[in-house]
Amino acid sequence: DETQKHFNGKIDFVLHSIGMSPNVRKNRKYYDLDYNFMNKTLDISAVSFHKMLQVAYKQDAIKKNGSILALTYIAAQRTYDSYSDMANAKALLESICRSFGMIYGEKNGVRINTISQSPTKTTAGKGIDGFDLFFDFADKMSPLGNASAEECADYCIMMFSDYTRKVTMQNLFHDGGYSSTGISKKMIEQYQGSK
């Protein structure tokens, strides 16, 4: 109610972009997770999205045909050694998007999508062991290179617009082509050079 008063009405769009794992920060391996930390990871990185959607839904806070986005990562579908329990959190986040996308779409035409972004140099990203090497690897594997934080913001703005009014319940890759690349010429050349 207070948010709607502050914005003089219903909300046009929302971006969920929070994520954190104490297990990742403490470099705990997936086979040795602290379950209290894991619960915190899931709560902050995924369940918070459900909580926000549930409140918005019950308060009827999002305008008809509004747009809701959450940032995710390809580790929800693939294995990345140092991503640990964040991969589970991102998989849950994407599932919440699909489940609530059906409900909110039928009720009010509200679109809910996730954007699977390239590795991005953020505070959270820097906490991942070996992040700089992985950032370089993904950049070399991607035909267009890694998408920057600014480019991700541009993509979000497009997804909030009416140009995407029929796009919902999707996980959209914004990664320079990384998600569809088997191996790039740059990586083959680097591998050959290391022999």
Write out the residue ranges for each language-model feature.
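Catalytic loop of short-chain dehydrogenase/reductase
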Residues: G19-E106, S116-K121, G145, Y178
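Conserved amphipathic alpha-helix within the SDR
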Residues: D1-G9
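C-terminal helical subdomain
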Residues: V47, T114, D132-V167, L172-G176
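Local beta-strand N-terminus motif with an aromatic residue
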Residues: K10-I11, M38
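Hydrophobic structural elements of the Rossmann-like NAD(P)H-binding subdomain
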Residues: L15, L69, I112-I115, G125, ...
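Short C-terminal tail/terminal secondary-structure segment
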Residues: T168-K195
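Conserved hydrophobic beta-strands of the Rossmann-like cofactor-binding core
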Residues: I11-G19
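Short beta-loop-alpha junction of Rossmann-like oxidoreductase domains
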Residues: V24, S118-G130, I183
